[in-house]
């Protein structure tokens, strides 16, 4: 499952050992504890600069975000891809669900990334 798999990849531990079970919901109060060792923290201690791009889904509160877990740069979604109103074809759609409007900010659709690569953007 999403959050649990990411926690294991970031820490090298079973997800339950670092307090992550299943997929974190938008109202979750937990996340990847900043005291937990991550591959990014390990690499940073050895002189590497770390970046992560894409979906994080290991906690949306400040203390759980990528920059508090060893990464120097981050670009992506904090939660799941279904947590903001964009159609899978990349078309901005109106979101009518009241719980989603309360839980997530309305984000703009990112355009003009076709045929671009991260080394050209960042």
Identify the residue ranges that each predicted region occupies.
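Formylglycine-dependent sulfatase
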Residues: 1-122
């Amino acid at each position: 499952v999403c959050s649990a798999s990411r926690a294991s990849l970031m820490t090298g531990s079973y997800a339950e050992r670092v307090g992550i079970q299943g997929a974190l919901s938008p109202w979750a109060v937990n996340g990847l504890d900043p005291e937990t060792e991550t591959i990014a923290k390990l690499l940073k201690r050895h002189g590497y600069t770390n970046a992560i791009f894409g979906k994080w889904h290991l906690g949306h509160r400040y203390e759980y975000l990528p920059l508090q877990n060893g990464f120097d740069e981050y670009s992506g979604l904090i939660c799941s891809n279904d947590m903001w109103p964009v159609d899978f074809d990349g078309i901005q759609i109106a979101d009518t669900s009241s719980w989603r409007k309360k839980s997530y900010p309305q984000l703009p659709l990112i355009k003009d990334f076709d045929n671009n690569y991260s080394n050209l953007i960042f």
